[in-house]
């Protein structure tokens, strides 16, 4: 989840703020502070799992306030703040929780300025896709907060780019350019487009050389897979979206491992030792080839492949040409795409 940074003008905005605005600003500041602390923790080389997310006091205060009658705008701010603390705090939430918030907090509520990414988090956890899409569309158009509208346009751009929906991503980019020219979201969208083109379908895959994770004396390179179909999988054990893809990858491996097909998972974990314990879990053996990418997203390999986020799957044909990427290789579409090239 991408969380917005604090506005430089925060102290000015706080002056004379109404109760709902004050709650929004306070929650925004608290979440940003903890996220920055987490990033510093990771940058220092400390294990991600050792970081303590603790919003106990904030959640207790919110519960106390929600137990009393509140103006609707204050209630909206409290509910979104509560969602933010629980999501960022890595609490497991049931779908009913997201449904209840959708029913209680309008899509265009200013409270979503606490962190616009909570809107996409909510939408991803709603059971009905049409309801989720409608809720996001309403917020994207009607939110009174410019940064919320810009964020949602950028997310629409990213989703359409991954889905190769050219008409939609071009429209979203144009809206960012005309309506939010000075926003960081426009800069992010332009950067994503530039990086995306590095692995466009039809071009040769960038060359690489990496030591095998299981046998450091062995080396993987694009040349070593020549003549085979290769699914390159940029991932990490800490990446929840990567973990969600693993059942589909195991299914694909079982189906196609005997059809001149290889998978090479390239880890962005903090250290190589993080991977073996994860693979010892019965549900995630990942019985294919593995390598560790030193430097992760900042590595030359990540730059060559234009990695903006993970998971990032890329299918390379036996000649070394990229034939499919991103959404074509995720979820149930992975097997469908592989059947297209390798047969059923």
Question: Predicted regions: what is each one?
Answer:
Residues 49-62, 88-100, 124-135, 165-169:
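Helix-turn-helix repeat elements of alpha-solenoid scaffolds
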Residues 67-78, 85-95, 104-118, 125-130, ...:
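Short solvent-exposed coil/turn linkers within tandem alpha-helical repeat scaffolds
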Residues 226, 234-251:
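Conserved redox-active cysteine motifs that mediate thiol-disulfide chemistry
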Residues 244-284, 294-303, 336-337:
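Structural microenvironment flanking redox-active thiols in thiol-disulfide oxidoreductases
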Residues 284-286, 293-339:
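Thiol/disulfide oxidoreductase modules built on the thioredoxin-like
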